[in-house]
C-alpha cells in the first residue's frame, strides 16, 4: 500500500511540474505574507564546487547560463509506541489523535547566469507541499525528515528560495575547471581564490558540508545525521537566511566566515536585514587530506548567535515568581547570546565506501532557532553498489546520540515546552537515532530510496518510545 502511494506520486509529471515552477514563482513577490508554519530547514546546495583534476586550456570557455531542477517526494509512517502520557508538543500515537502518516514534496529550479568576469547570479524558485505527523513539527530533538515543515502546507506553496550574487577573485596557483551543477557555472578558476556570496540562501549551502551525509533529498534524512544537530545556524521559518559569506581557498585549506540574519522573533519569517542586531557569526576551517591514498576532509566550526530570545532560567524564575508553569514565550526580555562549536570528518575507504562523523555542542541556555539539541555525536558509513553490479546505488548506515543542557532539562521537567518539544513531564535520557537507507537508481536521473529509523527516548524522555519510522523517497534531478 505504501509503495503504491509513493509510486503514484512519482509519475512522469514530476519533470514537467519541476520546470513549471519558473512561471508561477517569478510572479510571486517575496514581499507576499507567508504563513509562519513553514519549513524548518532547506536541503542544502553545496557551495564547494565540483572540481576536475586540472584545467585544460583547450577546454570550452566559461559557461554563461545554467539551468537545473530537482523534485523530491518523501512519504513516511511510524508505529504505535509506548506513551504513558503526552503533552502539548509530544509526538503522538494514532490513538492519541495523531495521524501516523507524513509526506513532503519539493521541487526546485536552479537558474544561474554569468554577469561579468568572476561575477555570477543565481535564483531558485521553489514549490513545497506536505505535512508532518499530526500537522505539527513536534516531538523529537532531531526530526526524521529534513524536508519537513513546522505545519501542514496543502495545497502547494510557491516562493523564492535563493537569490544571490557570487564574486570570485583569483589569487594564483594552478588553474582548475569547475563542473556545471546546481548553482554552479562551469569554467576555469584559480586553485587559490577568494569567493564572496551575498544575498538569500541557506546556511548549510556553505557550512557543515560532508560528502557522505549532507543532503536529505539523496542521503540520510535525519537532522542529526545530515548536519551538526547542535549547530545553531541562521534560518527563518522556511530555513533560509540573508547575509554575506566569504570563502578563501588556499592549497589544501579553505576558510569560510559569514554574518547571517536570524529572525527578529524566534522561528518566524521576519529577518533582521541590518545584520547588526539579530544575527549569527560563524567561522569554519577545512583541510583536505589523503590518508592511505584516499581523500578525506576535516572541518572545524565555531558559531555565535545574538538574537531576541528567552533564556530557560529566566522562564523558570518568572514561573516561580508568578506561580505558573514556566513559558519561554513570555520570558523574552531582550537580546541573548548562544554559542557553540562543531567538528566534521569525512574519509574515503575506497572508491565505493566512505566514513563520516560529527560532534557539535552549544551552551544551551536559550531557546533554539533550529533544533532542541545542545550536544550531538553522529557517525556512519555509505557504500556504493559496485559489488552487486549496481554502481549508482547507495546503502547507508548511521547512528546519532543527542542531548540538551541542564537548564533546558529543568525547564521541561517543570512542565515547560519549547517550539518543538514538551511532554508535560520529563524522565531525561539522551535521544538516540539509528538510520539506514538504500537508494536505487531506477532510471538515469531517478532514484528511489527505502529508509528506516529507530529513535529511542524521543524528545529525551525515557518514559516514551522507542519509535520506528518507515519511509520511501523518490528523487529526480535534471
Give the predicted meaning of each segment.
Residues 63, 101-107, 156-161, 238-242, ...:
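Residues that define the transmembrane beta-barrel architecture of outer-membrane proteins
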Residues 35-38, 162-174, 397, 466-478:
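Outer-membrane beta-barrel "beta-signal"
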Residues 71-75, 123-127, 196-200, 257-261, ...:
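Transmembrane beta-barrel strands of outer-membrane/channel proteins
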Residues 69, 107-113, 163-167, 198, ...:
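Residues on the lipid-exposed face of transmembrane beta-strands in outer-membrane beta-barrel proteins
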Amino acid at each position: 500500500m505504501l509503495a503504491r502511494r509513493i509510486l503514484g506520486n512519482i509519475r512522469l509529471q514530476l519533470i514537467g511540474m519541476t520546470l513549471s515552477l519558473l512561471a508561477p514563482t517569478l510572479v510571486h513577490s517575496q514581499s507576499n505574507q507567508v504563513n509562519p508554519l513553514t519549513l524548518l530547514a532547506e536541503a542544502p546546495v553545496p557551495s564547494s564546487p565540483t572540481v576536475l583534476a586540472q584545467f585544460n586550456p583547450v577546454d570550452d570557455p566559461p559557461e554563461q547560463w545554467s539551468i537545473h531542477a530537482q523534485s523530491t517526494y518523501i512519504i513516511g509512517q511510524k508505529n504505535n509506541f509506548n506513551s504513558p502520557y503526552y503533552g502539548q508538543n509530544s509526538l503522538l500515537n494514532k490513538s492519541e489523535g495523531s495521524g501516523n502518516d507524513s509526506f513532503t514534496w519539493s521541487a526546485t529550479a536552479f537558474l544561474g547566469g554569468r554577469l561579468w568576469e568572476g561575477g555570477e547570479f543565481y535564483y531558485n524558485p521553489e514549490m513545497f507541499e506536505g505535512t508532518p505527523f499530526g500537522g505539527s513539527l513536534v516531538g523529537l530533538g532531531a526530526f526524521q525528515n529534513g524536508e519537513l515543515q513546522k505545519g501542514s502546507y496543502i495545497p502547494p506553496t510557491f516562493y523564492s528560495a535563493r537569490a544571490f550574487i557570487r564574486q570570485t577573485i583569483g589569487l594564483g596557483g594552478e588553474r582548475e575547471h569547475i563542473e556545471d551543477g546546481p548553482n554552479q557555472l562551469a569554467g576555469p578558476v584559480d586553485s587559490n581564490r577568494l569567493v564572496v556570496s551575498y544575498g538569500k540562501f541557506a546556511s548549510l549551502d556553505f557550512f557543515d558540508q560532508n560528502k557522505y551525509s549532507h543532503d536529505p533529498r539523496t542521503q540520510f534524512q535525519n537532522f542529526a545525521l545530515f548536519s551538526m544537530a547542535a549547530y545553531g545556524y541562521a534560518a527563518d521559518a522556511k530555513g533560509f537566511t540573508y547575509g554575506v559569506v566569504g570563502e578563501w581557498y588556499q592549497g589544501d585549506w579553505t576558510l569560510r566566515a559569514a554574518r547571517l540574519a536570524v529572525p527578529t522573533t524566534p522561528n518566524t519569517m521576519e529577518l533582521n536585514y541590518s545584520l547588526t542586531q539579530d544575527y549569527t557569526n560563524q567561522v569554519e576551517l577545512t583541510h583536505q587530506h589523503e590518508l592511505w591514498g584516499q581523500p578525506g576532509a576535516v572541518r572545524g566550526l565555531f558559531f555565535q548567535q545574538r538574537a531576541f530570545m528567552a533564556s530557560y532560567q529566566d522562564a523558570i524564575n518568572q514561573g516561580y515568581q508568578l506561580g505558573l508553569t514556566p513559558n519561554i514565550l513570555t520570558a523574552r526580555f531582550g537580546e541573548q547570546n548562544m554559542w557553540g562549536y562543531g567538528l566534521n570528518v569525512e574519509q574515503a575507504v575506497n572508491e565505493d565506501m566512505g566514513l563520516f562523523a560529527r560532534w557539535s555542542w552549544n551552551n544551551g541556555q536559550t531557546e533554539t532557532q533550529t533544533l532542541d539539541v545542545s550536544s550531538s555525536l553522529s557517525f556512519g558509513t555509505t557504500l556504493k553498489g559496485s559489488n552487486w553490479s549496481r554502481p549508482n546505488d547507495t546503502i547507508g548506515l548511521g547512528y546519532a546520540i543527542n542531548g540538551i543542557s541542564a537548564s533546558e532539562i529543568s525547564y521541561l521537567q517543570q512542565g515547560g515546552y519549547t517550539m518543538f518539544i514538551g511532554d508535560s513531564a520529563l524522565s531525561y535520557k539522551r535521544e538516540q537515532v539509528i538510520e539506514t537507507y538504500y537508494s536505487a537508481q531506477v532510471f538515469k536521473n531517478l532514484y528511489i530510496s527505502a529508509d528506516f529509523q529507530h529513535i529511542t527516548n524521543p524528545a529525551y524522555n525515557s518514559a516514551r518510545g522507542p519509535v520506528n519510522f518507515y519511509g520511501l523517497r523518490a528523487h529526480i534531478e535534471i
